[in-house]
Amino acid sequence: MIRLVLIAILLGALNGAGQDDRVSRLKWMSGCWVRATPRFTMEEQWTVPRAGTMFGIGRTTRRLVSADSVSEHEFTQIHLVNGKLVFSAHPSGQQPADFTESELTDSSVVFSNSQHDFPQNVRYMKGRADSLYAAVDGTVGGSTRRADFRYARTACEK
């Protein structure tokens, strides 16, 4: 009986480890990223994968004459649901939405939700050690739209 319990515990641990490994394939996303222009700064910060999940936060700051102003923010989570990665987005001023993994490689991931208004796809691609590419795309009113974002690695503020 003890042997059966130990085998069950071991199999459960191995199953969980495999799921954690799936999220861990996105470790290259972890860290702090910035995209700056004269008019705005976009920042994303991703935690290191742990316990089958990653958390992210994004902020867009617009440069105004008198001061900077946060115009948008988003809280995100990447986690496992039924063996697939799910990107859960909570953007400011919009309803939360889940996007399910449709493609995963060692250097890119695509999350899709064909029922979402826009975007229907969220993509992250590993660049060089100091860059991260992101894109959102989909169809709006019968027209295809896409927005691409290139981020540079930056030091995480303490």
Locations of the language-model features?
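Short, low-complexity Ser/Thr-rich regulatory SLiMs
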Residues: 48, 80, 126-128, 153
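Central antiparallel beta-sheet cores of small beta-barrel/beta-sandwich binding domains
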Residues: 35-115
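A short glycine-rich beta-turn/N-cap micro-motif
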Residues: 50, 54, 128-133
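Edge beta-strand at a domain terminus
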Residues: 17-19, 106, 131-158
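Well-ordered alpha/beta subsegment
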Residues: 106-113, 117-126, 133-138
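N-terminal helix-cap/turn-to-beta initiation motif at the start of protein domains
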Residues: 18-32
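Sec-dependent N-terminal signal peptides
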Residues: 4-13
